[in-house]
Amino acid sequence: GAATMASTLDVAGNTSVGGTLFVTGAGTFDNNVSVSGNLVVGGTATVVGAMSIGGALSVGGATNLLGTVTVAGNAGFLGTVRVSGATSLDGALVATGAATFENNVSVSGNLVVGGTTTVIGAMSVGGALSVGGATNLLSTVTVAGATGFLSTVRVSGATSLEAGLVVGGKAEFNNDV
């Protein structure tokens, strides 16, 4: 079933929910989080351990994810997002603020970021890629759909763009394109 928290939630141990988890305020999880349905956090979210979501993930504030992240559905972030572990999404990812991925990122749908974006590991996008701020991609990049950068872009690794590329600022590719 669904669990609803009417305020902030601060959990010290592992969190496992068999259905959907709604938190109207901030959510702080000091260990692993497993939710078989959707996870919705109205405020900021911090997860110290690994996160596995069977449905969609939605966060209304700044997000700090320190472990691996696996989401079966779409992920939406209304603030900045920082992910330290590997990220795997079976849907789309939309972040209105800046996004920092300190490991590999795999998104089967579209990846849309409104602010600056930094990806330290390899990035694979099954749909379109759109970034509104300056972009720094430090490893290989593979994008199946259209790719658009509204500001400067710097890519250090090999790049495979299977559809069109639009860049609104300076573009620097340090490897094969």
Features from the language model and the residues they span:
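Intrinsic low-complexity, repeat-rich intrinsically disordered segments enriched
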Residues: 1-177
